[in-house]
C-alpha cells in the first residue's frame, strides 16, 4: 500500500508541475482525475475528487531566510503543492508550514475568510526543534468553523525577517460512501483514502499522526520526504514532520 501511495503522489504531482494547467482547473489532489470547475452547486468529494469554483491564488509559497548574509538551509515554506492551495474535510483543520531554525523567533499565524476578515490569529516564539509544524485551528467558541466551499487564506509571518508565506484552504463535503469507508479503514488505509480523494491537508495530518505514533518506523519519514520532493519542497523534506 505504501509503495502504491508513493507512486500516486509522485506521478500526479509531477504531471501537475509539467502541464502548467491554469489555477482554476487544477485540484491539488494525489491520485484523482481533475474535473473542470463547476460554478454551480459544488459536488461532494469521494474517491474521484470534486469540482469547485476558482479561488484567488495567495502570496509566496517559499521565502529564503538570511542570517548574517548567509542563506539558511531551509526557507520559510507553506507546505502545499505548487498551485499553493489544498482541500480539507475538517471544520477545524491542521495547517502545515516550515519555519527556519532560528530559536526565539516570533511567528504570527493568521487565517482570513473570503472577505479578508480575520478568523483566527496566534503568535508564538520558536523553540529548538527544527521541522515542519502542523498548527491545528482550535475549536474555540469564538472561532467559527470553516464554511463549505469558501476559500480561506492563511499566512505565516516572521517579523524579524520581514517575510511571510501564504496558502489557500477550502473545506469540502465528503460523500456518505466515503465517510463509511473511512470510518472502517485502518490508519494506513485512511491515508490512502485521503490521498485518493485529493484532501491534501487531511492527508498530511494523517501522515504526521502515523509518524508520531510510530516514530521508529522509517516508511513514514520516507513517504514524507517523497511528498515534499514531488511538491518541489525538497529542502524541507529532509527535516521531520512534527
Model-predicted segments: where are they?
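Inward-facing hydrophobic residues that define packing positions of alpha-helical scaffold repeats
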Residues: 206-207
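Extended, polar beta-sheet/loop recognition surfaces of beta-rich domains
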Residues: 32-46, 51-58, 62, 75, ...
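Preference for solvent-exposed, low-hydrophobicity sequence contexts
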Residues: 210, 214-217, 221-242
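Bacterial N-terminal signal peptides
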Residues: 11-23
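Bacterial N-terminal signal peptides that target proteins for export
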Residues: 2-14
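Solvent-exposed serine/threonine-rich low-complexity stretches and specific carbohydrate-binding patches
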Residues: 118-131
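Contiguous beta-strand segments within globular domains
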Residues: 82-101
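Extracytoplasmic/surface-exposed domains of secreted proteins
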Residues: 97, 132-170
Amino acid at each position: 500500500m505504501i509503495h502504491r501511495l508513493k507512486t500516486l503522489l509522485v506521478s500526479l504531482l509531477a504531471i501537475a508541475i509539467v502541464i502548467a494547467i491554469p489555477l482554476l482547473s487544477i485540484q491539488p489532489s494525489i491520485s484523482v482525475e481533475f474535473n473542470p470547475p463547476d460554478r454551480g452547486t459544488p459536488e461532494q468529494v469521494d474517491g474521484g475528487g470534486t469540482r469547485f469554483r476558482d479561488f484567488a491564488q495567495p502570496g509566496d509559497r517559499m521565502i529564503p531566510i538570511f542570517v548574517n548574509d548567509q542563506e539558511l538551509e531551509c526557507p520559510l515554506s507553506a507546505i502545499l503543492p505548487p498551485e499553493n492551495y489544498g482541500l480539507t474535510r475538517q471544520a477545524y483543520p491542521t495547517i502545515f508550514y516550515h519555519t527556519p531554525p532560528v530559536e526565539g523567533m516570533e511567528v504570527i499565524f493568521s487565517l482570513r475568510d473570503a472577505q479578508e476578515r480575520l478568523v483566527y490569529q496566534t503568535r508564538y516564539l520558536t523553540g529548538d526543534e527544527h521541522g515542519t509544524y502542523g498548527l491545528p485551528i482550535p475549536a474555540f467558541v469564538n472561532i467559527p468553523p470553516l464554511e463549505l466551499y469558501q476559500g480561506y487564506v492563511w499566512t505565516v509571518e516572521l517579523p524579524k525577517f520581514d517575510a511571510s508565506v501564504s496558502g489557500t484552504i477550502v473545506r469540502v463535503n465528503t460523500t456518505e460512501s466515503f465517510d463509511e469507508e473511512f470510518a472502517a479503514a485502518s490508519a494506513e488505509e485512511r491515508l490512502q483514502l485521503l490521498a485518493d480523494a485529493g484532501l491534501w491537508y487531511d492527508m498530511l495530518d494523517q501522515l504526521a499522526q502515523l509518524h508520531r505514533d510510530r516514530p521508529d518506523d522509517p516508511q513514514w519519514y520516507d513517504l514524507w520526504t517523497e511528498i515534499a520532493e514531488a511538491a518541489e519542497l525538497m529542502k524541507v523534506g529532509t527535516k521531520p514532520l512534527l
